[in-house]
């Protein structure tokens, strides 16, 4: 009878994650300097994200009613992240009302 040495050791691999995007990049504190309140930021970013999303949908149809992203989008970046970056860079002006 032969016994084979079997090692129960496992090689733990280190998880690799992409850096977080969205509300963590750009930082929320920088974004809040651009608007009057966190609620205004939510509404402002959501409206712009809807415009960007509509632009992408209409681009497939050849209709350009909305303005596309004002910053260069990263591959796979969501419209809300694009909108937050536009706000942070100062490409959009927020008006209460």
Curated annotation (Swiss-Prot):
InterPro entries (alphabetical): DNA-dir_RNA_pol_omega, Pol_omega/Rpo6/RPB6, RPB6/omega-like_sf
Going by the UniProt record, its keywords in alphabetical order are:
DNA-directed RNA polymerase, Nucleotidyltransferase, Transcription, Transferase
Q: How does it assemble?
A: The RNAP catalytic core consists of 2 alpha, 1 beta, 1 beta' and 1 omega subunit. When a sigma factor is associated with the core the holoenzyme is formed, which can initiate transcription.
* Superkingdom per UniProt: Bacteria
Q: What does this protein do?
A: Promotes RNA polymerase assembly. Latches the N- and C-terminal regions of the beta' subunit thereby facilitating its interaction with the beta and alpha subunits.
Q: Per the UniProt record, which EC number(s) apply here?
A: 2.7.7.6
* Designated gene of the protein: rpoZ
Where does this protein come from, organism-wise? Corynebacterium efficiens (strain DSM 44549 / YS-314 / AJ 12310 / JCM 11189 / NBRC 100395)
State the protein's name.
DNA-directed RNA polymerase subunit omega
GO CC annotation: DNA-directed RNA polymerase complex
* Family assignment from sequence similarity: Belongs to the RNA polymerase subunit omega family.
Q: Which GO terms describe its biological process?
A: DNA-templated transcription
As one GO molecular function, the record gives: DNA-directed RNA polymerase activity
Q: Quickly give the catalysed reaction.
A: RNA(n) + a ribonucleoside 5'-triphosphate = RNA(n+1) + diphosphate
């Amino acid at each position: 009878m032969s016994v084979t040495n079997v090692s129960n050791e496992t090689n733990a691999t280190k998880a690799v994650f992409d850096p977080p995007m969205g509300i963590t990049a750009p930082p929320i504190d920088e974004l809040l300097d651009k608007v009057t309140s966190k609620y205004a930021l939510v509404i402002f970013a959501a409206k712009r994200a809807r415009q960007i999303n509509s632009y992408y949908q209409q681009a497939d149809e050849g209709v350009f009613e909305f303005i596309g992203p004002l910053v260069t989008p990263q591959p796979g970046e969501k419209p809300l992240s694009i909108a937050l970056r536009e706000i942070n860079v100062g490409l959009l002006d927020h008006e209460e009302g």
